[in-house]
Amino acid sequence: MGMSVTISVATEQDAEQIFRLQYLCFQSEAALYGNYRIDPLVQTLDSVRQEVASDCVFVARLGEEVVGSVRGKVTEDGAAAIGKLCVHPRLQGHGIGARLLRAAEAALAEERGAKRFRLLTGHRSEGNLRLYRRSGYETVGRSRGADGVELIILEKQAGAYAATA
C-alpha cells in the first residue's frame, strides 16, 4: 500500500524543500513564456523563509518529502492574495493542487478574515486556469507582471470556498 499525500501548515524546516520544489515546478511556466526571470525562479531562500514565517503557507507531503506548496496573505483591501501554488511534476493531475488551494482558502477566511480570494496566473497557463475556474474563480482583469508576463487576475468571494471544499 502506498503512502498518501497529507496537507499541513508549513514549518520553518520546510522552507528549503519549498524553495527547491518551486524552482523545479516553475520551469515549465518559464519555458511557456520564454522567460526564466519569473518571480518563482528568482526568489531567494531567505525570502521563502520570511513567507513561511509570516504568511499562510501550506505544504503537501508524501512521507517526509514536500511535494506541493501554496502561499497566501491578506492584503490591505481585505482580499487574500494566493500564489506560488505548485505540485511536483510527477504528482500533478491527482487533485493535490485543488486540496492545497482549499486549505489556503479555509485558513485565510477563517483565521485571517479574508473576504475574497485573488490569484494571478500567466495568460497561457491553461492548466492553472482550468484548476482555478473549477475551484470557482472568475476572471476579473489582466495585468503585466514585473517580469513582463501578461497575467490574468481571478477572484472569488470567501463565502464560496465552502461550496468547493
Residue ranges and their predicted role:
Residues 47-59:
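A short helix-loop-beta-strand connector motif used in the catalytic cores of GNAT acetyltransferases and
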Residues 108-121:
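Conserved GNAT acetyl-CoA-binding A-motif
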Residues 59, 65-73, 81, 86:
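Conserved beta-strand in the GNAT
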Residues 6-20:
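A short beta-loop-alpha structural element at the N-terminal edge
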Residues 89-92, 118-129, 145-149:
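Conserved beta-strand-loop-alpha-helix junction that forms the acyl-donor binding cleft
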Residues 19-48:
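Conserved GNAT-fold acetyl-CoA-binding loop/helix
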Residues 98, 123-141:
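Conserved active-site alpha-helix within GNAT-family acetyltransferase domains
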Residues 91, 95-103:
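Conserved acetyl-CoA pyrophosphate-binding loop and the N-cap/start of the following alpha-helix
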